[in-house]
Amino acid sequence: MEKRKDTKTTLAKASDDQNKAWYVINAEGKTLGRLSSEVAKILRGKHKVTFTPHVAMGDGVIVINAEKVRLTGAKRAQKVYHYYTGFISGMREVPFENMIARKPAYVIEHAVKGMLPKTKLGRRQMKSLRVVKGSSYAQYEAIKPIVLDA
């Protein structure tokens, strides 16, 4: 079997990262998983025609109204977040209701982080995510974000 020579794959250069767009997504009434997968897709750059898996070419995302995200079924009462304090018997469990009241940004960041690559590239892409409690994103007006209805 002979290899075809008429098809070419174009790969993006690392310098194409300069023209990063920023998007605003309202989390109010949206399901956590569906919202997170949409955000992860934008952070990775999969929505672009020039997507290259090994280059950080994704755009930035600002998520507003983080405290108004919803879960389906009985997960609102059953979902539990775990963390370790570093001490003996230091495993802690925090129910979703308490976490969304205390740290609403963490809930979305945790979900999106799980959908990105577990590499240096994934950690770099995670830096382009901003999660805001409430509907005001005035501190990000200088970057002229595009409001999405996603």
From Swiss-Prot:
CDD domains: Ribosomal_L13 (cd00392). One of its GO terms (molecular function) is mRNA binding. SUPFAM superfamilies: Ribosomal protein L13. Pfam families: Ribosomal_L13. Keywords: Ribonucleoprotein, Ribosomal protein. GO terms for cellular component: cytosolic large ribosomal subunit. One of its GO terms (biological process) is translation. It comes from the Bacteria. Signal peptide: none annotated. Transmembrane segments: none annotated. Belongs to the universal ribosomal protein uL13 family. HAMAP family: Ribosomal_uL13. This protein is one of the early assembly proteins of the 50S ribosomal subunit, although it is not seen to bind rRNA by itself. It is important during the early stages of 50S assembly. PANTHER family: LARGE RIBOSOMAL SUBUNIT PROTEIN UL13M, RIBOSOMAL PROTEIN L13. Part of the 50S ribosomal subunit. This is Large ribosomal subunit protein uL13. It comes from Chlamydia muridarum (strain MoPn / Nigg).
